[in-house]
Amino acid sequence: MAEYDLTKRMAPFFDLHLVIPLLEFIEPRSIYDHDSLIKVHRRVLLKTNMIDSVIETYPEGEVPKELEQRKVEILSQREKLKVKVDPVVEILESEPVKAMMDSRELTNNRILEYVTANHGLTEEMLDSLFRYAKFQYECGNYSAASLCLDYYRNIVPQQNPNYLSALYGKLASEILLQEWTHAKDDLTKLRTYIDFNPFDTELESVQQRAWLMHWALFVYFNYPKGRDEIVEMYLNQQPYLNTIQIACPHLLRYLAVAVVTSKTKQKNSLKDLIKVIDIERHNYEXPVTXFLTCLYIKYDFDEAQKKVEEVLSNDFFLTACLEDFRESARLLIFEMFCRIHQCISIQMLAERLNMQQVEAERWIVDLIRTYRIDGAKIDSKLGQVVMGAKTTSVHEQVMENTKRLTFRAQQIALQLEKMKLDKKVCIILNFIYCEDFRNF
């Protein structure tokens, strides 16, 4: 099971606080040695100010005395920061200022000019607000951090060196509070900033897009139609697809699940996804991607069925949609099998799908009606499923060939880009410690 776990591979792309839920998720699943995992969990917590959580990892009576001392120091520091930030919050919570921040017509610069001129707000006071928000976040007080960061990002200009960190911090706070509607809004704002604020180097742009896609997993797998948005962002936006291929091919697991389980994107996206999976097979392969490879490239149905069974329930992000994936995978196996054989007995299909014959026939009828599978008919007398021949128009052939040529051109451009960035991409994977909210 450990060979399919992506926690270690993905951790460098997350903030420490976002890694903690992943560790808590895998602890009871016996994927790794329990004692070793507890020590890792403790080391992660020690890099935060969540001292009470650290203490809980020790057996009763074995808590180091220095932790109690550190707890006292943290409480003292929080009070000192609070004294400095209280006047700032009082200004920002005044009715005129709140009305200005709620207005979509005023820029951050205009609001800052007003507050500076009329309330004496200084740059030092704003820095105090940011430090207090970050401190509350490190203590695990995500509600307080979210509130302060919301004030901060609504008043400082985007050129401020802490602005991007505030966007990340606000998103992380909402994720950890499981406020998915707010998190979705924050994710959109962060993506807009990354997409429309070119960074100094292409390497930095790749870093930012890689972080964004990893953090987005928390939101998209907990938000209605989030899987469709994964397909739109990860597969249909070339800069993000390039980033996956250059820096984080393991995200193909989540893209594959999103495509397979999507009710609206699956049909149009499967071909493009399979091409990418085939190209990246030497960089990343997992039960999910291998299932599609077996089904659409090798045409190995027995192996494909085994791969479906191997899809793990031990993935933090995929547990909620695992049954959807299995059901959709069963449909893909059925459709592909019938398209190749054109005529097949329901009894054989039932065996393939691990179902009783009557149950399988009912299931197939429902599938044909629900998904409108082209040309599929059931001959109940003969106990067969018959797939009618589908003719492809000249227009469809031209469109498909054009798409194929476009895809190949994009892949050639990507390979050239890879040659330039391969020597530098290790920086991304080793970029574990940082001074802002992305500090893992």
From Swiss-Prot:
Disulfide bonds: none annotated. Keywords: Cytoplasm, Initiation factor, Protein biosynthesis. It holds the Pfam family PCI. It is found in: Cytoplasm. Its main location: cytoplasm. InterPro entries: eIF3e, eIF3e_N, PCI_dom, WH_DNA-bd_sf. GO terms for molecular function: translation initiation factor activity. Coiled coil: none annotated. PROSITE patterns: PCI (PS50250). Residues 219-392 form the PCI domain. GO terms for cellular component: eukaryotic 43S preinitiation complex; eukaryotic 48S preinitiation complex; eukaryotic translation initiation factor 3 complex, eIF3e. Belongs to the eIF-3 subunit E family. HAMAP family: eIF3e. Component of the eukaryotic translation initiation factor 3 (eIF-3) complex, which is involved in protein synthesis of a specialized repertoire of mRNAs and, together with other initiation factors, stimulates binding of mRNA and methionyl-tRNAi to the 40S ribosome. The eIF-3 complex specifically targets and initiates translation of a subset of mRNAs involved in cell proliferation. This is Eukaryotic translation initiation factor 3 subunit E.
